[in-house]
Amino acid sequence: VHFSDAERDAIAAIWGKIHIDEIGPQSLARVLIVYPWTQRYFSKFGDMSSVAAISGNPKVAAHGKVVLGALEKGVKNLDNVKATYSNLSQLHCEKLNVDPDNFRALGDCITIVVASKFGNAFTPELQNAWHKFLSVVAAALSSRYF
């Protein structure tokens, strides 16, 4: 996948404004709430019986930070995203048995949280580049499945 200079600039601009400690927990919590079947992958996280329980769960927050923090590797390696996430793809495929459709769902939730945080500053042009980036990351994470 080729990223244009404008797309690279947009992705860097978005990433430069993201606070992992805020966006990460909100994004993972949103996935677990909107797509409740994803909770099965996080059975060790304890109580996830309600929106409040998920949103206030410190293990969800901590893992959300890890998940979002892992995106930085992709941002820094736009020319080789697939190789960047090869080990994570293998882990999620062979050990964790995560349905690869969930990577797209997570990307959608990250985008929603980012859009709600940045409001009108999250222009269609920025969204287009960000969506392309997250789609490439989701494909890379799914690569060991196919």
Swiss-Prot record:
Heme b binds at H63, H92. Disulfide bonds: none annotated. Residues 2-146 form the Globin domain. CDD domains: Hb-beta-like (cd08925). Keywords: Heme, Iron, Metal-binding, Oxygen transport, Transport. Red blood cells. It comes from the Eukaryota. GO terms for biological process: hydrogen peroxide catabolic process. One of its GO terms (molecular function) is oxygen binding. GO terms for cellular component: blood microparticle; haptoglobin-hemoglobin complex; hemoglobin complex. InterPro entries: Globin (IPR000971), Globin-like_sf (IPR009050), Globin/Proto (IPR012292), Hemoglobin_b (IPR002337), Hemoglobin_oxygen_transport (IPR050056). Belongs to the globin family. This fish has two hemoglobins: cathodic and anodic. The cathodic Hb and anodic Hb display small and large Bohr effects respectively. In addition, the cathodic Hb displays a reverse Bohr effect and appreciable phosphate effects. Heterotetramer of two alpha chains and two beta chains. Involved in oxygen transport from gills to the various peripheral tissues. This is Hemoglobin cathodic subunit beta. The gene is hbb.
